[in-house]
């Protein structure tokens, strides 16, 4: 079952996406919500500083940190990417510190704070990659080499990755800025796939 952090931000949209896919989920609002049924976690978009404080005050920080440290699947979108990052290049706060990347908060500034784009999502080391076109579905046993063609990217005052460490793999970039990463069973995007009708990234997460 997917636990969706629900202390602040766009958690309802992730829940709706999982409903559409027929995948069970549970909202995480307090430490007691994080039980043995949770085998994957979504960290939604929102305000990362507020979420960081509420993670501590609700007692959810430790169980989620232990989940990530155990190598279990986690998906962070926008603020969720910030919470996962090893370091922020314009903020002294560090939260889970699990994603080998330096992330820049509010990287696009106010003028370009919200915009849409389209790009391929995924990485390929050769000709053997599985390519999933719009309208198609990600296989349940999706390989590491998988490319989601023409994925719609919705940004709302999003971050981008200022520096990618060796443990992380770039999944997508826009105008030269890295906005999607994968590291083992960690998936992180600066954009909001839950605000689109395209379920492929959530399907990829559920396959991890």
Curated annotation (Swiss-Prot):
Its EC number is 4.3.3.6, 3.5.1.2. GO terms for cellular component: cytosol; glutaminase complex. In the presence of PdxS, forms a dodecamer of heterodimers. Only shows activity in the heterodimer. Pfam families: SNO. Keywords: Glutamine amidotransferase, Hydrolase, Lyase, Pyridoxal phosphate. The keyword Lyase applies. This is Pyridoxal 5'-phosphate synthase subunit PdxT. The keyword Hydrolase applies. The active site is at residues 78, 192, 194. It catalyses: aldehydo-D-ribose 5-phosphate + D-glyceraldehyde 3-phosphate + L-glutamine = pyridoxal 5'-phosphate + L-glutamate + phosphate + 3 H2O + H(+); L-glutamine + H2O = L-glutamate + NH4(+). L-glutamine binds at residues 46-48, 105, 156-157. GO terms for biological process: glutamine catabolic process; pyridoxal phosphate biosynthetic process; pyridoxine metabolic process.
């Amino acid at each position: 079952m997917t636990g969706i952090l629900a202390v602040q931000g766009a958690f309802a949209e992730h829940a709706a996406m999982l409903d559409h896919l027929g995948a069970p989920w549970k909202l995480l609002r307090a430490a007691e919500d994080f039980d043995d049924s949770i085998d994957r976690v979504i960290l939604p978009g929102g305000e990362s500083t507020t979420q960081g404080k509420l993670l501590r005050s609700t007692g959810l920080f430790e169980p989620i940190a232990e989940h990530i440290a155990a190598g279990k699947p986690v998906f962070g979108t926008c603020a969720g990417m910030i919470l996962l990052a090893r370091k922020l290049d314009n903020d002294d706060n560090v939260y889970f510190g699990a994603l080998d990347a330096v992330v820049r908060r509010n990287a696009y500034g106010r003028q370009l704070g919200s915009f849409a784009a389209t790009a391929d999502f995924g990485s390929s080391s050769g000709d053997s990659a599985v390519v999933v076109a719009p309208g198609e579905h990600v296989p349940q046993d999706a390989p590491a080499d998988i490319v989601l063609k023409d994925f719609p990217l919705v940004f709302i005052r999003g971050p981008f990755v200022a520096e990618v460490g060796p443990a992380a793999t770039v999944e997508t970039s826009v105008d030269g800025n890295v906005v999607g990463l994968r590291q083992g069973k960690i998936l992180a995007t600066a954009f909001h796939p839950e605000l689109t009708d395209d379920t492929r990234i959530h399907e990829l997460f559920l396959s991890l």
